[in-house]
C-alpha cells in the first residue's frame, strides 16, 4: 500500500507546478546557465517549496486529518505556488552593489 503522506507530497508538487503555470510563471528558468539562475519558475523552486510545506504540515505539525491527505497536499500546493509567484513582492531582491 502506498504511503498517504508520500502521495500527498506528489499531489502538492503537481498542483504547485500547474498552479504556477496558471499564474504566469515560466515553465523553466530563462537565464542560462540554469544552475546559476535565481529566477523563479514553475519547475524550481515551486514544487520543492510545496513538497516541503506538505511534509511540515503532515509530519512536523502532526496533522491527523478528517480530510484525506491528498486534498491537504493539493491545498498546500496551490498556496505554495501563489507564495512562489509573488515571493519577490514579499521579499524584494537586494540592491546589487
Curated annotation (Swiss-Prot):
A Pfam match: NiFe_hyd_3_EhaA
Localization in the cell: Cell membrane
GO CC, alphabetical: plasma membrane
UniProt cross-references to InterPro entries, sorted A to Z: Prd_NiFe_hyd_3_EhaA
Transmembrane segments: 5-25, 38-58, 67-87
Topology in membrane: Multi-pass membrane protein
Origin: domain of life: Archaea
Key words of the record: Cell membrane, Membrane, Transmembrane, Transmembrane helix
Subunit structure and binding partners: Putative multisubunit membrane-bound [NiFe]-hydrogenase eha is composed of at least 20 subunits.
Assigned protein family: Belongs to the EhaA family.
Function: One of the integral membrane subunits of multisubunit membrane-bound [NiFe]-hydrogenase eha. Eha is predicted to form large electron transfer complex and might catalyze energy-driven reduction of low-potential redox carriers.
Protein name: Probable [NiFe]-hydrogenase-type-3 Eha complex membrane subunit A
The encoding gene: ehaA
Amino acid at each position: 500500500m502506498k504511503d498517504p503522506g508520500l502521495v500527498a507530497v506528489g499531489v502538492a508538487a503537481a498542483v504547485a507546478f500547474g498552479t504556477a503555470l496558471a499564474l504566469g510563471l515560466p515553465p523553466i528558468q530563462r537565464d542560462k546557465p540554469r544552475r546559476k539562475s535565481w529566477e523563479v519558475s514553475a519547475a524550481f523552486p515551486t514544487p520543492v517549496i510545496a513538497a516541503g510545506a506538505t511534509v511540515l504540515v503532515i509530519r512536523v505539525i502532526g496533522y491527523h486529518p478528517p480530510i484525506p491527505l491528498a486534498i491537504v497536499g493539493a491545498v498546500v500546493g496551490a498556496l505554495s505556488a501563489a507564495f512562489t509567484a509573488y515571493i519577490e513582492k514579499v521579499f524584494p531582491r537586494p540592491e546589487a552593489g
